[in-house]
Structures are given as structure tokens and as C-alpha cells.
Regions:
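C-terminal helix-coil-helix/basic helical segment that borders enzyme active sites and/or dimer interfaces
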Residues: 46-49, 59-110
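Glycine-rich phosphate/cofactor-binding loops in nucleotide/flavin-utilizing enzymes
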Residues: 2-24, 101-147
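Generic recognition of well-ordered alpha-helical segments
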Residues: 12, 33-36, 85, 92, ...
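Catalytic-loop motifs flanking and including active-site residues across diverse enzymes
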Residues: 9, 29, 58-61, 82, ...
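Generic structural signal for hydrophobic core residues of well-folded globular domains
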Residues: 37, 56, 73, 97-101, ...
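Glycine-rich beta->alpha junctions and the first turn(s) of the following alpha-helix
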Residues: 1-62, 121
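Generic, well-ordered alpha-helical scaffold segments in large soluble proteins
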Residues: 16, 36, 40, 65-68, ...
Length: 147
């Protein structure tokens, strides 16, 4: 069985990766943990409020980016930017969760998993560095990086 056209595997793989990079899971995989952290967060601290505002803004921007991709309103190759943004956002959420729970983060399996797994988001679907290269070369038209 062949998916796509025989001899066109690389192009088919690139098309599949475009789809993988923009799934909503890129944005919301730690959202339940974030909501738990919100319950424990010290909202009297202005730095905590600032971080909450940044995360909430990130969720809104991420939803717009993912929606544009799904509706095919984004330029070709822009999924790399969406993936980078959502990945960085998920790491920010994991950092907030870890800071909010403190040492208790290591006592809850779900929290521990979310915090420890977060750096992996920069690898799945292509590393963030590769995504930046794709964005520069395919979207912005910058010259290729020397090989």
C-alpha cells in the first residue's frame, strides 16, 4: 500500500508534517495543569498576575494561529511559525505550573509529567531551530543557511 504518489515520499512527508505542526494539541496539552496552577497561584503578586496575563494572551494568539492554519488562511510554510509559537507557549505554561506548585510539582504524576515532558515539545514535529529555518527560507524568502 502506498500513501500518495509512488516516488513522491518526501513531498508527502512534508505535507503530513505541515498538518502535524498545527494541531490544537500543540496549544492545549498543558491547559488542565495550568487551570490547576491558577487555583494555587498567588494572585496578589504582580509578577504572577503579569505571567497569567501573558499566558492567557498566548492562548488567544495560539487559537488564532491554529484557526488560520485549519481554514488555510495562512501562507504556505507558516505552520512552522505556528508550531514555534505554540511550543514556546507550552513551555511557558509548564514553567508557570512548576513555579506555582514548587516542590509539590514532583508529588503529582500529571503535574510531574507535564513539567518534565515540556522540553520535548521543541522536538516533536521538527525542532524549533528547524522551524525557524523553514520560516526564514520559505515564508520570509531569506537565503538558505550554509551547509
Amino acid at each position: 500500500n502506498v500513501v500518495g504518489i509512488v516516488g513522491n515520499a518526501f513531498k508527502q512527508t512534508m505535507a503530513q508534517l505541515e498538518h502535524e505542526r498545527v494541531g490544537i494539541d500543540r496549544l492545549v496539552s498543558n491547559q488542565a495543569l495550568y487551570e490547576l496552577a491558577l487555583e494555587r497561584a498567588d494572585r496578589s503578586d504582580p509578577r504572577v498576575r503579569q505571567e497569567i496575563a501573558a499566558i492567557e494572551t498566548g492562548y488567544r494568539i495560539g487559537r488564532i494561529l491554529v484557526t488560520r492554519e485549519v481554514l488555510r488562511q495562512a501562507p504556505a510554510g507558516f505552520s512552522a511559525a505556528t508550531k514555534c509559537f505554540c511550543t514556546e507557549h507550552e513551555i511557558r505554561v509548564a514553567d508557570f505550573v512548576a513555579a506555582t506548585f514548587g516542590a509539590d510539582a514532583m508529588l503529582w504524576d500529571d503535574v510531574t509529567h507535564g513539567v518534565v515532558y515540556a522540553p520535548g515539545y521543541t522536538i516533536m514535529g521538527g525542532t524549533s531551530n528547524i522551524m525557524r529555518n523553514i520560516l526564514g527560507e520559505r515564508v520570509l524568502g531569506l537565503p538558505r543557511e550554509p551547509r
